[in-house]
Amino acid sequence: MPPAPKNGSAANAWRSERNARPREVWRAIVPKNLMADDTTRRLLAVAGQLQTLLFQIELLKRCDPEVLVKRALRAKIKHNALMVLYLHSRLAGDLAAQAAHRLTVGIYCLWMWLRRACSEAAALANEIDTYATYRDKDRFFSATMNLSPGGTCRLHSLVGLSLYGRTQDVTRELGLINDAENLLKQINYCHLIVSTESAEAALVGVDEFLTATVGGGMVASPETYDHTQPCCICLDELSVTANQGDTIYKRLGYSVCDHLVKQVKVNVTPDDVLRHMPFLNSVDANTLRGAIDKLRGSSGGEVGGGRRLAGVVPTGCRAEVGRSEQEDGAPAGDDRADLEHEARASRILDSYDVFTEAPGPVYRLSELRYWLASGKAAGAKTRGSCAHATHQATVLQKLDTDLSAMFARAETFERECRSAEREIFGTSFAHFHRHVASKIASVRGVGGGGEALIDKLLAGSPATAPEAEIETLISSCYSHHMSLPLFSRLGNPEKADTDALVEILKSYRDQTRPRADKAGGRAEDGAGDCDDEGYPGAADATRRGQRDWIGRVRVDTAAVADEHEDKVKKLLDRAERDLTTRRKNYAERLSARSFSNLDRCVKNQRAELEKLLRVNVYGAALPAMYVELKNGFLARQAFMKAVTSDESQHIRRCRLAREDVEGYEQHQYVRSALMRTSLDPAALPHLASRFYELVSGPMFRRHVERFPQPPNTSLYFTVENVGLLPHLKEELASFTRTYAHAEWMVSEFREFYDFSGISGVSETQRAAYAYIREAVFAAALFESIFQCGRAKLMRADSVEVDAGGPLLTDGIYLTFEERFPLIAIWGVGEDRRLCATSVVVTEKDLYAVLYAVLHKQDK
């Protein structure tokens, strides 16, 4: 095709010729990849618009219905609802056909959002009309927010799953998206004993639940998920990271799932909210400017400029101001008490000498004084940098004090918003959070202050971003821990010394008080011998201590001190230096370890806190899991439809009757030949890998990825994600360790993959494993004995499917369907489709289908 002219009459002629060409010609001219890219772009644009509409609908549900009725929004909402219905009429047929053929994550999300947008937009438009008639806000919010007490919760549904054999149907209740994820993993594990029809019915229920949750838009409601339950991606991540000696299950217990719903950092300031107040676009500019000027004059500052209204000082701010004023003033009472304790201790110690029998508390007091004196110099240097304020409040009181300023800002912001609305619009809007504020406050009042505090944190506020709440809570956590005695001693050693001094003085006082009581009539004399502080017994103890237990007379201690002053001073200096070094090293090591543990603990709790308070949006993990599992059963369904369809021209041979004498002879011929030859034990590892490939679920196909992993990895994730019991995992691992014919040859004539008479999920699953093991071992022996080529075993749910159907190759397919478990195909065309020369043999006997493969050239 010649290039398009740039301009002139030739360009016009070229455009006319282009428009005259039929669409099929243009499809032939335009490359397919360009058409696919254009379609993808269009679908992404539609998906983005649907997601935006769903988010706006969620906002309008919480808006004052008077605004929706009086202003032009009512017509716009109905217009959007009609546009969504138009899109549904144009796309629903193709999307439904695509969902029944093969899915991608993008197509499935678009299909979910389109269905949900139709129902939500129509419901909102109807409720607005109802409110325009009855003017009942309670009714409007109850209907839009699904708060009716007698109504059914759309987030609770029952999903049933039928299994092979006499096993009763399994029923699961879906209330959280975690429940849906667990059910998908369970179906993935039990795919060997689930028919296509049963899986399709169960997946329809899961699809409806996902449409009601994930299909509702971006933001995930807190009642739809539980971040403490790990998902399959959590297990995958922990499987490739260092375990630090802990088991995978212990580490999963401490994990915070961020895959089903992903947290998003939202830093919105009150200025941003005020700057983007709703409905301002419809307000006249002069009216808006005049209202802003009036609000500035009444508040004494800028509206939305970060300043508070004049005269409003939050409770928490007043507490901080009072605390700072107290710190800037005279020394606190605690410091004066410390000085008094030290003076009293000095007077008590001075009343005892080597000739005086001192009680036990005095010795402890002397030792403490020694340690205090040796560490005094180091303590004086670190007093200013390590001192911390002592918090006397309880944890909740301290937390409430720290958060009061933040809550006060939210209340002030709410008052400013109401003032702005009254000034601009003439009324204050009764949005959802304001309409139910009194009810929420009454519920909070029943639980007490602690529950009200937690409720405020979880509910949040337009004036406070989640990040600000998180930082405030973390700061409060550090402040609380630093106020504990352990960290106070690490941060301020002198505080620990003072506490020990007080304890020793108290103990000494308790021991000396009984002596003063026994004095009786000598109380007045004893009072005269008290020290200046009135400490009883000090002077009396001095008089009674003139002679000790060996009868030594008091000596002149001053002369002794003068004689040995130099030696003692050198010894004390050396001991003090050594002691200072040891204390410093010990304190540094203990402080580093303690603060490291505290930081690690706070870091772990911070992850929990961030997940709880941040805005969470639905991730792509759950839709991707649904798509992978659904595509597996869709591939099995497409395969069965292709080989059993009457429209195909291939040769079909269906052998299912048990009265077939010829088939029985074929069965006996192959079975007898296999029983005369034993399996090579060296081939067991390879056969085990083939077994793992066939039994692993369609959701985890790690062995067929671009960078394939061993097949046992796929099976590992299949069984670990459902919490399979250890003895069942050991039994599954040992399935391929035996090679005796009597143990692995389990099927009789035309009874392959027959579960009649078997009940229980574990027993049915065990029988399916036994049948597949028999197929793997029999095919390997068949190849080695008859030398007729490879008897390739394949899975029907692993075939590639395109617009024309499944792409096949010659071999034996395991369908995992109880009615048609084995299908042998040969003679596939070059395009990997069934043609007139293709032969399809449907069997229920393993050895008869091997006989058919052996004689395929004769047929």
UniProtKB/Swiss-Prot annotation:
This protein's name: Tripartite terminase subunit 1
A Pfam family it matches: PRTP
Biased composition (Basic and acidic residues): 512-525
Gene Ontology terms for molecular function: ATP binding; zinc ion binding
A GO cellular component entry from the record: host cell nucleus
Main location: host cell
Assembly description: Associates with TRM2 and TRM3 to form the tripartite terminase complex. Interacts with portal protein.
Keyword presence, Protein biosynthesis: no
Protein source organism: Psittacid herpesvirus 1 (isolate Amazon parrot/-/97-0001/1997)
Source taxonomy: Viruses, Duplodnaviria, Heunggongvirae, Peploviricota, Herviviricetes
Zn-finger region bounds: C3H1-type: 231-259
Residue numbers spanned by region Disordered: 512-542
Domain of life from the UniProt record: Viruses
Binding site for ATP: F782, E783, S784, I785, F786, Q787, C788, G789
UniProt keywords, alphabetically: ATP-binding, Host nucleus, Late protein, Metal-binding, Nucleotide-binding, Viral genome packaging, Viral release from host cell, Zinc, Zinc-finger
A single GO BP: viral DNA genome packaging
Coiled-coil region: none
Function: Component of the molecular motor that translocates viral genomic DNA in empty capsid during DNA packaging. Forms a tripartite terminase complex together with TRM2 and TRM3 in the host cytoplasm. Once the complex reaches the host nucleus, it interacts with the capsid portal vertex. This portal forms a ring in which genomic DNA is translocated into the capsid. TRM1 carries an endonuclease activity that plays an important role for the cleavage of concatemeric viral DNA into unit length genomes.
Entry's family note: Belongs to the herpesviridae TRM1 protein family.
Subcellular location(s) per record: Host nucleus
